[in-house]
């Protein structure tokens, strides 16, 4: 019973102690090894360090904070002359694993890191080969600053880079070499496409130090996918702008005509607020999408102003406003209706009448009578009676003055005629005023309809032109 337990305990001790050859090899290598010493036999020569990046995933590119966050593996390779051995002397052991704090490692950091810990890589073991070559592949979540150009947002392309370099070793101590910029394990991002990448090494001398330092930069050229923004921002605004056009088809008598235009302006302001939350607070450039939204908002405000103007036309009358002058009448009641194939009730509107009206522009009345004129009826009879009474009354006055005859019957007759004349004159003037009021009101209402039709065409054309200009300015539309 005790024998199996004892054998299991001895086997466990053997596993914990590891291979005797590896233990002996580690002891031999670490004997006299100084971690702070550069691993080179000739101290005048630099240690050649190769650095590569295996990009796994683009986690986020924050436009608001101008930061790029990725998941990547770094691959460091260098040769440690103090860690070589002959495998046959150690039972053909060809490689060892060491913790990173046990061996010399280059103090290479990510210069443009914005992570709170600055160095966010995970400290994995180093692989030591018998030739002295060291492989070290620490994974990490790297967050770097990335200056964004938001002018073409959301049809934009951004260039971000990862700048690595030694913090203390100068160029004559560490020489950097380009490693692989690998995307074999890359997980595609839903918002960004990698269209180009490159690696370059630069030598720079800083003001703090007289020596030269090398750094290696891995650059990513990204292009934004536009489907999300086109579907959730651009398309709704275009549909909202259709309401601006449809607002001019509503009758000017409807009070909700102005309310519809104001609602459209408020809706566009909401989209502007959403866009401002997506872009950084910068005064260097205005995003293309912002230009489009502001233009649509301006068009909406302009449409609201014209709608108010149209309604003021519709409710005008002779008692409050003056009659149209010749140019307004010619443009709104003759030329524009002829151009738009519109016709005022009971009025001919063709090229001939347009020409005649233009030729008679110096006359005060250059338009034909409307449907409110009466050919025969009580009004005409009263008007004729007023003229007849006026003539008779003036003739009697003349006779009285000439003959100087003023008996009581004549005077009474004159008084009766005076009263009849005054009443008929009042009725005639009242009817003329009503007739004139109706004609003037009809002209203003027709002018309001004409302006509405002109705005319908003008704003439709304006929205189409603005949309085409914005689309042509974009570097690309679909990605």
Curated annotation (Swiss-Prot):
Q: Which residues form a coiled coil?
A: none
- Which UniProt keywords are listed? Cell membrane, Disulfide bond, Glycoprotein, Ion channel, Ion transport, Ligand-gated ion channel, Membrane, Postsynaptic cell membrane, Receptor, Signal, Synapse, Transmembrane, Transmembrane helix, Transport
Q: Cytoplasmic side: which ranges?
A: 252-257, 307-453
GO MF entries: acetylcholine receptor activity; acetylcholine-gated monoatomic cation-selective channel activity; excitatory extracellular ligand-gated monoatomic ion channel activity; transmitter-gated monoatomic ion channel activity involved in regulation of postsynaptic membrane potential
Tissue specificity statement from the Swiss-Prot or TrEMBL entry:
Expressed in interneurons, motor neurons, pharyngeal neurons and muscles.
Tell me which species this is from.
Answer: Caenorhabditis elegans
Protein family per UniProt: Belongs to the ligand-gated ion channel (TC 1.A.9) family. Acetylcholine receptor (TC 1.A.9.1) subfamily.
**Domain of life assignment:** Eukaryota
Entry GO CC? acetylcholine-gated channel complex; neuron projection; plasma membrane; postsynaptic membrane; synapse
List the taxonomic lineage: Eukaryota, Metazoa, Ecdysozoa, Nematoda, Chromadorea
Cystine pairs annotated here are 146-160, 208-209
The GO annotation for biological process reads: cellular response to nicotine; chemical synaptic transmission; monoatomic ion transmembrane transport; regulation of membrane potential
Name by which UniProt lists this protein? Acetylcholine receptor subunit alpha-type acr-15
């Amino acid at each position: 019973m005790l024998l199996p337990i004892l054998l299991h305990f001895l086997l466990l001790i053997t596993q914990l102690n590891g291979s005797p050859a590896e233990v002996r090899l580690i002891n031999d290598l670490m004997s006299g090894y100084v971690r702070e010493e550069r691993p080179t036999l000739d101290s005048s020569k630099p240690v050649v360090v190769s650095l590569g990046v295996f990009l796994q995933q683009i986690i986020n590119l924050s436009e608001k904070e101008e930061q790029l966050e990725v998941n990547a593996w770094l691959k460091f390779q260098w040769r440690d002359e103090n860690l070589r051995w002959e495998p046959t002397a150690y039972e053909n052991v060809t490689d060892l694993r060491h913790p990173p704090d046990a061996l010399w490692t280059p103090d290479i950091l990510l210069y443009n890191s914005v992570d709170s810990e600055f160095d966010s890589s995970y400290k994995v073991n180093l692989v030591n080969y018998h030739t002295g070559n060291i492989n070290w592949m620490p994974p990490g979540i790297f967050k770097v600053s990335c200056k964004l150009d938001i002018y073409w947002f959301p049809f934009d392309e951004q260039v971000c880079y990862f700048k690595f370099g030694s913090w203390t070793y100068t160029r004559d101590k560490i020489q950097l070499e380009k490693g692989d910029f690998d995307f074999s394990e890359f997980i595609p991002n839903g918002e960004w496409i990698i269209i180009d990448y490159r690696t370059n090494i630069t030598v720079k001398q800083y003001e703090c130090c007289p020596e030269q330092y090398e750094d290696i930069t891995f650059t990513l050229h990204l292009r934004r996918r536009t489907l999300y923004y086109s579907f959730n921002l651009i398309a709704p605004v275009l549909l909202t702008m259709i309401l601006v056009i449809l607002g001019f088809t509503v009758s000017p008598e409807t009070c909700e005509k102005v309310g519809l235009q104001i609602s459209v302006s408020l809706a566009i302001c909401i989209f502007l607020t959403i866009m401002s939350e997506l872009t950084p607070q910068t005064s260097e450039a205005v995003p293309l999408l912002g230009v489009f939204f502001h233009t649509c908002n301006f068009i909406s405000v302009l449409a609201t102003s014209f709608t108010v103007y149209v309604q003021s036309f519709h409710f005008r009358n002779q008692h409050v406003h003056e009659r149209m002058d010749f140019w307004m009448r010619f443009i709104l009641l003759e030329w524009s209706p002829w151009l738009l194939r519109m016709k005022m009730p009971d009025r001919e509107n063709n090229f001939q009448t347009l020409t005649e009206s233009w030729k008679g522009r110096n006359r005060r009345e250059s338009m034909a009578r409307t449907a409110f004129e009466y050919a025969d009826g009580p009004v005409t009879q009263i008007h004729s009676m007023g003229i007849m009474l006026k003539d008779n009354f003036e003739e009697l006055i003349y006779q009285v003055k000439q003959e100087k005859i003023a008996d009581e019957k004549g005077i009474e007759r004159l008084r009766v005629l005076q009263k009849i004349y005054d009443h008929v004159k009042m009725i005639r003037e009242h009817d003329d005023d009503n007739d004139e009021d109706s004609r003037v009101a009809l002209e203003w209402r027709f002018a309001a309809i004409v302006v509405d039709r002109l705005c319908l065409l003008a704003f439709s054309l304006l929205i189409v032109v603005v949309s085409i200009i914005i689309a042509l300015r974009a570097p690309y539309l679909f990605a």
